[in-house]
Curated annotation (Swiss-Prot):
One of its GO terms (cellular component) is nucleus. Transmembrane segments: none annotated. This is Proteasome subunit beta type-3. Pfam families: Proteasome (PF00227). The 26S proteasome consists of a 20S proteasome core and two 19S regulatory subunits. The 20S proteasome core is composed of 28 subunits that are arranged in four stacked rings, resulting in a barrel-shaped structure. The two end rings are each formed by seven alpha subunits, and the two central rings are each formed by seven beta subunits. The catalytic chamber with the active sites is on the inside of the barrel. Its main location: cytoplasm. InterPro entries: Ntn_hydrolases_N, Proteasome_beta_3, Proteasome_sua/b, Proteasome_suB-type. It comes from Dictyostelium discoideum (Social amoeba). GO terms for biological process: proteasomal protein catabolic process; proteasome-mediated ubiquitin-dependent protein catabolic process. It is found in: Cytoplasm; Nucleus.
């Protein structure tokens, strides 16, 4: 088994009209053994930027703690929050710096950029090779199942309600096709005025 699939888990980010959504499953396991069903892989950096980290859980937590440390230093020095693009560049550098002994994680970054709240999403592999797009990105053990559903259901310029419905349906449909992730999901929809967070009840087996 790949070390990337050792703990299972999966994340999706999607772009809407002046909003973005990020979702992850809630399972934490060790190979086929389920340890917890309340372990989201999505972390809040600030009100307009979230990071989803799939892969080896120990590395994901270490990477998140280092990212929060860097973000707090930036906030002290600059007196403002990091934008999603800055967070993406920082994560890319942090991962590439450890390329000879990498963190076994695949981060996704999403948020709203600048005063006009332009949606931004990006993802990267374990050594920081980043990809930015304007529709959706998926990472984790159920990637093969997620791609088809996301390509089928995704539409451009969805409002926040449609975006929530679409990302939820993609998540729930994919969870049934992967034994290493599932047990429900959590969805965050980031809008210019608020962050909407909801939990989804999936199959508990």
């Amino acid at each position: 088994m790949s070390i990337m699939a050792y703990n299972g888990g999966a994340c999706i980010v999607m772009v809407g009209k002046n909003c973005v959504a990020i979702a992850s499953d809630l399972r934490f396991g060790i190979q086929q053994q389920t340890i917890s069903n309340d372990f989201p892989k999505v972390y809040r950096i600030n009100d307009k930027c979230f990071v989803g980290i799939s892969g080896l859980v120990t590395d994901a937590q270490t990477l998140y703690q280092k990212l929060v440390f860097r973000h707090n230093l930036y906030k002290l020095r600059e007196e403002r929050d990091m934008s999603p693009r800055v967070v993406s560049n920082l994560l890319t550098n942090m991962l590439y710096e450890k390329r000879f002994g990498p963190y076994f994680t695949e981060p996704l970054i999403c948020g709203l950029e600048g005063p006009d709240n332009t949606p931004f999403i990006s993802g990267m592999d374990l050594i920081g090779a980043s990809v930015a797009t304007d529709d959706f990105l998926v990472v984790g053990t159920m990637t093969p199942a997620m791609y088809g559903v996301c390509e089928t259901l995704y539409k451009k310029d969805m409002n926040e309600d449609d975006l929530f419905e679409t990302i939820s349906q993609c998540m729930l449909a994919s969870l049934d096709r992967d034994a290493l992730s599932g047990w429900g999901a959590i969805v965050h929809v980031i809008t210019p005025t608020q962050v909407i967070t909801k939990k989804l009840l999936g199959r508990q087996d």
